[in-house]
Amino acid sequence: MKNFFLASILVVLFNTSYSQNNEGFFGEKFSITELEEYVSVRENIYDKSNYNVIIEGEILSSCPMKGCWMKIRAEKDTILVRFKDYGFFVPKAGIEGDKAIINGKMSIEKLSVDLLRHYAEDAGKSKDEIEKITKPEVSLTFLADGVFIENL
C-alpha cells in the first residue's frame, strides 16, 4: 500500500512537471488579442530592432531534438524563433502547419556558421549538408517569452 501511494505521487509529479500546459500556451501566457499586423512590424524592424511584439505565423518546423527552436512563416518571411533563457520548449513534432502566435522580441541577426551548423544538426541534416554551411547568414529572429499554438 505504501509503495502504491508513493508511485501515485510520483506519477502526479511527473505529469505536472512535464506537461507545460493544456491550453496551447508555452512559456509566459499573454493576451493574444494584442496581435500586431506582421507587415507593419516588418516595415519598422530596421527602425526599432529588438522591440517587443506579438505576431502570428505558420509553423514550418521545430527542433526534433528538444523543441528548443522553431521556424515560422509570416507573410513571405521565414523567422527563426528561439525561447527566452531556454525556459520552455515546444513539441518536437506534429505542429507543422499549425498557427503560432508568439510574444517577444523580433530582430535581424547575423547567425554564425557554428550556430547554423548546430541547427542543421538538430534538424537531422546529413554531414555533407552541414559541411556546405560555410558563411554566416543574416536572418529574421525572434526571442519568444511565450508561444500559443492553435489546435493543441
Show where each model-derived region lies.
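OB-fold and OB-like single-stranded nucleic-acid-recognition modules
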Residues: 20-152
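Bacterial Sec-dependent N-terminal signal peptides
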Residues: 1-23
